[in-house]
Amino acid sequence: MGPRLQRGLQGLVSKEPLDPRTFRNVLGQFCTGITVITTMHDGAPVGFACQSFTALSLQPPLVLFCPTKVSRSWQAVEASGHFCVNVLHEKQKDVSARFGSKDTDKFAGIDWRLSKLGSPIIDGTLAHIDCSVHSVHDGGDHFVVFGAVHSLSDVPHKKPRPLLFYRGDYTGIEPDKTTPAQWRDDLEAFLTATTDDTWL
């Protein structure tokens, strides 16, 4: 780590403590999708709801998510070395609630199958991304986990709307936003920029 980066990181640390509630309220203004990260551990399926998932790199194809350091589900992912990202759609609030809870058997009543790497794919999700753990980095009270993408689900012909989380509650997008967006070439900074079969 070079001196400039070290100084930059030191400057990011607030000298005055931030109120946790205010911090969460402000960050809650940023709308996110909801995923379920899954793996297998000791022959049993393991999973947890996660809104910190995001795309990271196209070449090589990488994604990331940020589990808390005390997460037992993350420990299972770390032990297995692989995971599947299940992207939820708007009618899967119950799935999100189940995997965001402390239920001992989160997969009870959930239909699933194994991915090529051996992680659970939850039936009926908007998309799934099969990954191996690429690297793990420190992120305060969380870890930042980079995942190497091995395979992807097909994009459904009929696109259901995604399940979103905003200001501490579930939300969605307007019905007319599920139609494909017109092609545009001015979004090079967007890792998931629109193509002929995607939308903003």
What are these regions (language model features)?
Residues 2-200:
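Basic, polyanion-binding surface patches
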